[in-house]
Amino acid sequence: TPTGPTGAARAGRAGGMRALALGRGALPPGQPCVEAVSGLFATALTRGGLTGGHRVTLVMPEDAPAMRQESLLRLGAQIIHTPAQAGLAGARALAKATAAEKGWYYMDWLNNDDNPTYHRRETGPALVRSTAREGSSIVDSIVIGVGSGGTITGVGETVKAWTKGARIGSAKP
């Protein structure tokens, strides 16, 4: 799986989604980004965004783990809190509203087609190449953890295109 500077697959996805947005002009150079996220994707987005010249603001519930928040702040992220009871839905709503109000780019990784597009272009082909024997992939089935659905969509479509009859399974982490 393609990875980014943190070594995690989500780092590759964050960088890939940013590159796709830049490429189509949705994310102009220097435009700040906002996203509702606090995990590995947040770390990858912060690192990649800042090295690429995009200030990153993360919106998360106030009860997100303190160590994670401290780490993200040290990396250079700005954090906006929502009430804990608002959960991810509240954080996403505030991120979207903040982007609209300030003219920032809202990555919206859970609903953005750049997520599966990245996996169609990078992760899926990397998997097929790594399993290729005599010109064809030997993958007959694959199980993929499902969060946003981007990985299973992009990788699943790629594997099925290269390996007729391949079965794609999901696992909820």
Where are these regions (language model features)?
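PLP-dependent amino-acid enzyme catalytic core
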Residues: T1-P173
